[in-house]
Amino acid sequence: MNYRGIYRRRYVFVLLLLVAVVNISYGWTVLKNKDYKRRYLSPSGVEKVRKHLSRKYVASRNNTQTFKKHYFSNTWAVHIDPPDNDVADRIAKKHGFTNIGKIGNIEGHYHFKHEEIGERELEKARHKTALLNLEDEVKFAEQQKILERVKRDGIPNDPYFKDMWYLLNTGQASGPAGVDMNVVPVWKKNITGRGIVISVLDDGLDWTHPDLEANYDQTASIVLNDNDNDPMPRDSDADNCHGTRCAGEAAAIANNGICGTGVAYNAKIGGVRMLDGQATDALEASALGFRGDHIDIYINCWGPKDDGKTFGKPGPMAAKALRLGAEQGRNRLGSIFVWATGNGGLTDDDCNCDGYTTSIFTISIGCIGDHGLSAYYTEKCSSTLAVTFNGASHKEGRENKMVTTDLYHQCTEEFKGTSASAPLAAGIIALTLEANPLLTWRDVQALIVHTAQITSPVDEGWKRNGAGFHFNHKFGFGRLDANAMVNAAQSWKNLPAQRKCTAASGFDHQDIPRGDSLFINIPTVACESSSAQIAKVEHVVLTVSFVHRRRGDVSIDLISPKDTKSQMLSPRKYDDSDEGLDEWSFMTVYNWGENPKGIWRLKITDNPNQDDVMNLFNGDNTDDVESLEERVIDTQTKQNKAEWEKMRKENPYFDVPYPTGVRKDKVLGSTEINDNSFDTPHTETFKIIRNHIPEVNLQNNDNMNTLNFDPVTGRKKNSINKKIINSRKRNFLTFRNFLKKSKKVQVQQEETGTQRVQVNAGYENPRISCESGYTTCSGVLINYKLTFYGTGE
């Protein structure tokens, strides 16, 4: 056989094949390069690429795009009319779906799931949506977007500690004795939450925990992520402990020698597993509307990111579920939705940017530490109703421990954030509902307003509204007092039916001056001479739309006819968005009890260079009032402990009497400030000062600046400080002019130079067109609407 000829032919064949491949590759490269040059190297192509990259970067900085890997779920919300489960099953089967069931308590709305549609099969999903919408019985079908939701316990953990100082504070923590929730007197009345059902909407509930099992309620539990009835968390992931920890604070069993004690330790507890997976509007609506005929209180310790730049609110179905829960839940008395305000204080976040906490149907709960002072990550806003305790201190560093149940049948003292505060509030509300089961959802809120106690009394943020109620944007109406709330509930008369009055609206575009304020007077008769007339307001909702060069520079204040000021939006240094807001509803509870008739004032301010303002007026040498109070409290605590130790040596049976804490026994009248206004054993220093305070009227908050003495703190105002402040203001104005010049140069460089991968907060948005025709505005107010909720005469 001629092997040499065979090898030669094979060699020639391989050589020809390689030549062909090289030629084809070269030709393809030429065509590709020509196409590349035609598409991308032309001036218009380069500009398109630049704008595309710029948009992507701005979107990532402003958090306006959701993570795209899981943007759509494989579930649909389908509205079928007339509502019929058999029709829903037929339509679902016809198009390859599975009918999971009704969406919460919304009539005619069904949850469909398609197992064969992947997360990136958008065309196939659109085709399925179109087919569903062609059905005669289908009013609408919508594929569900996946919403990003985060748990609110992201605070560093601490070593183990067994004493629950927030339930009975005898001085075992670093703070003073008596600063607690005053829950022991309620337990002594045999009020322990019996007959009340609480459900935790979270990442699951380890109901087999020996400190929870006897109180577990299967009817109040479900798994919405997997359509199951067992809410056991996926304990392979240690982060899925959040719901179990919330449950333990509210309803852990007492007197069983295990872990700690829940506030309402005889209440029933359930869990809705909804955070262990993809969140959608339909899923949230299902959770918020789940078994409203059986569940009394829903604990919610989740929401949009606390990053200081996000605006997030319930979707249309979740918002409707909240409303229907308030209208129809608990046999039409109204479901109680307790919500944690968030932990975004370190990023200057504002809880009014969270549409869940600003809903009139939710009870927004903030947090304080063992000294009764605000936590270092506290968010301030006008929708906060009250505060309870958690392990945080006023300054970052020292932490106290919170005892609760944990995964693997363990006990932990490492629960932090407002997630540790909201379950305590839910427990107190459970005690209140046992004392009076006929309370409506509005009655519960009103009881909080009437009975919450002043905490951190020297804080200068305490004001009094036109109806005589104290409030503070850090603390709401104050710290929840279980005993005071239960006592008031036992003789409480239900509020009259709620009324809604759309008081005023404006649709004329108005400029927001650069570095200045837009003032709008809003006269209203509060729907006088109609069935919607309101004489006592409860919730005030301000809905606004505006565009602005930098949303984080905008602050919004609303002043009532009684001169009560609510900051509806505060500046946020990390919010670089230039998109403004579209029909965003801010809410305040701080006009509670006022007659809304009169002239309301709306103030919208552009606050450029807010960081420089804070540095000038709050330098390192400036002590905040709460830090000073903390040092005074610590001194008094040490003295008290020394006296107690001495008495124990003289009398071995001596025990510390139950302390009164920082409480007010009633809502003070406008001239009732006296030595007993803030009854606390460790504030003698402040009482000495108050001995010299003349009687003052707190009703007009704007006139308080003219007094020589601050009526809330009892401290003499220092005229030297005014000189210092005026000097700092002059320095600031000079510095701001310098920044304006620097900013102008920087803008010119950005416009004429190469695009940098950086978003500067000071850049002007070329899309904003000032109504005045000049370029002196920072933004434009598009419209506003003022809505009152309350009662008539």
UniProtKB/Swiss-Prot annotation:
Residues 30-152 form a propeptide. Residues 495-638 form the P/Homo B domain. Its EC number is 3.4.21.-. One of its GO terms (molecular function) is serine-type endopeptidase activity. One of its GO terms (cellular component) is trans-Golgi network. The keyword Glycoprotein applies. Disulfide bonds join 259-411, 351-381, 501-527. Residues 164-486 form the Peptidase S8 domain. The keyword Transit peptide does not apply. Residues 1-29 form the signal peptide. Keywords: Cleavage on pair of basic residues, Disulfide bond, Glycoprotein, Hydrolase, Protease, Serine protease, Signal, Zymogen. The active site is at 202 (charge relay system), 242 (charge relay system), 419 (charge relay system). Glycans are attached at residues 62, 190. It comes from the Eukaryota. GO terms for biological process: protein processing. Probably involved in the processing of hormone and other protein precursors at sites comprised of pairs of basic amino acid residues. Belongs to the peptidase S8 family. Furin subfamily. This is PC3-like endoprotease variant A.
